[in-house]
Each structure stands twice: as structure tokens, then as C-alpha cells.
Amino acid sequence: MSAFDHLGDMGPIDIWDGVRARTVDGEGCSFGVVELDPNSVVPEHRHPNEQLGMVVSGTVSFRVGDEVRELGPGGIWRIPPDVPHEVHTGPDGAVVFDVFSPPREDWAALERAEPLTPRWPS
């Protein structure tokens, strides 16, 4: 396996309705470029992975535990393991970067679609 890849050559995985990710797994973490359609919802959920992320484009309303923030490009979040969280996108949708530790085994088990042009970079 090569140490390098290109986003446009990676098939996305469908995470929820209107939410797809292109992921790379390392030994200690997973990295994802996640595309969220306009007005989409990532329902409340939790996982055993620590999660760090940043909005690249668009806007999201992000709830982590009891705290809610409206985030645009450059907005960053930190989610400890097993803390409930959810996301709602605005009318333009969003592209975000996510890093998980340990790696997301549940995402790694999902089937990848054929590669298609990513929304970012444009």
C-alpha cells in the first residue's frame, strides 16, 4: 500500500442520508473528509473514539453534550469518547475534516462507492 493517495481517487462511504466520507486509516487514527448535503442531519450518536474536526466549507450547527455552536470555515471541535453529539448543516451543506482515535472500525467495514468528484477542493 502506498503512503500517498488523492481524494478524487477514493470511493466515498455513505455514513447517513446525505453524509458521505472519504477515509484513510492509520494504526492509531482515522482521517475523514466528510461531505454533508444541504440541510442534512447527523443524528445524535456517540462512539468510543475521541474525535477532532474542522469545517472546511459551509456551515454547521454542532451540539456536543449540552453545548451548541454555529461553525463556519475554520471552526474546530473536540469530542471526548462516548459523549453524545449531533450536527445540522445549513442551506449550502458543508465539508469537514474529522480525525478519530482509535480508528473507526465501523466506518472501515462499510462498502465504498465508485470514486466521484469530491465537493472539496473545488
Please describe what each predicted stretch is.
Residues M1-G28, G32-V33, A109-S122:
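A short, N-terminal "cap"/entry segment at the start of jelly-roll beta-barrel domains
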Residues H47-N49, G75-I76:
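Amphipathic, hydrophobic secondary-structure cores in small proteins
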Residues P81-D106:
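Ligand-binding loop in jelly-roll beta-barrel domains
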Residues S30, T59-S61, V68, P84, ...:
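Structural motif
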Residues E67-P81:
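Short acidic-glycine-tyrosine-enriched beta hairpin
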Residues D17, G32-R46:
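Conserved short histidine dyad/triad with adjacent acidic residue
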Residues N49-E50, M54-V60, G65:
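Glycine- and acidic-residue-biased ligand/ion/polar-headgroup-sensing regions
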